[in-house]
Amino acid sequence: MHSTKVTYPEPMQLSGILDQYESFQVTPCIGTEFPKANLAEWLHSPNADALLRDLAITIAQRGVVFFRAQTDLDGELQKELTHRLGVQSGKPAGHRLSKHPLHLIRKDDPEMGVLDPGRQQKLHGVENTQKRQRAVLEYHSDGSYEVCPPDFTMLRMTEIPPTGGDTLWASGYELYDRLSTPYQKFFESLTAQHEVPSLRKLAETEPGIYDGPRGAPANTDMQFKQSHPMVRTHPVTGWKTLFAGGLHCRRVNDVTDFESEQLLSKIISLVGDNHDLQVRFRWNNPGDVAIWDNRCVLHCPTQDHYGLGGRMGYRTMGIAEKPYLDPNSPSRQEALAAAAK
């Protein structure tokens, strides 16, 4: 018998074209901000492809990138930018933007999500009246219930309260690096189930729900449930990242219920116990933008702004590859150490 050798993408390298723009690392391991850049100008630039290629690589390496007061952006430009980031960083042909399954019922743009607290409450059930004691449990990766989950999410805020409503991100690269070697190898051997039961329930009760492809031909499952490797390799960086834990990751496969609870609790405790692998972003201006890579970060809203003012934003998500693990890929810290030699 002849075995077929599996080949994986080569990591992409920065060209340096973004060095001309002021930027700073918000924390050492996650988050970069371009305080004065204009994304609309980048999109319309003659070298837009080169700019977006390096922006995509930067997001993949840093997890999340921030821009301030992008008032020249509208919904169509936001959709174009999100899609082109994926194209310039090698997403599969035929993969476009995610389509929300409720867009027909809401009569919305299928590729543009509206962040509205009232809508979220209606989708996910009645408001929880218990005291909030573990907000860390709201960390999640967007669309992880899909066969091919999202790559880049772009969130553009148009209305912000005077205080509150910050968003946090946690680095999946650093979560993996914080594990001991035996735990790393153990997690690499496992898969976990991601699902959103509230969407599945709506699919069973709402005749008008969209049942076509959600940004990729493979994304048609109306159970909104999918299993993925708990450790995946990022195709752009080539680094291993923990791809588990959080709101939508419901169960570790092939272990007992008790063991699954222990493993998922360990991951979420790593997030909550280590603020130095997180970054927190304050939305200061209408038009502030965050673009993050769901393949290597979890993110979490801060639900402290209710009654303090309106909060409205628009979200787009590109669709990436089916998650995979290259067992020979390095961790982020291993790759950075090798590059420094």
UniProtKB/Swiss-Prot annotation:
The keyword Iron applies. Gene3D superfamilies: Clavaminate synthase-like. One of its GO terms (cellular component) is cytoplasm. Alpha-ketoglutarate-dependent dioxygenase; part of the gene cluster that mediates the biosynthesis of oryzines, natural products with an unusual maleidride backbone. The two subunits of the fungal fatty acid synthase oryfasA and oryfasB probably form octenoic acid. This fatty acid is most likely activated by the acyl-CoA ligase oryP to give octenyl-CoA before the citrate synthase-like protein oryE catalyzes condensation with oxaloacetate to form tricarboxylic acid. This is Alpha-ketoglutarate-dependent dioxygenase oryG. Pfam families: TauD. Binds 1 Fe(2+) ion per subunit. Fe cation binds at residues 140, 142, 299. Its EC number is 1.14.11.-. Disulfide bonds: none annotated.
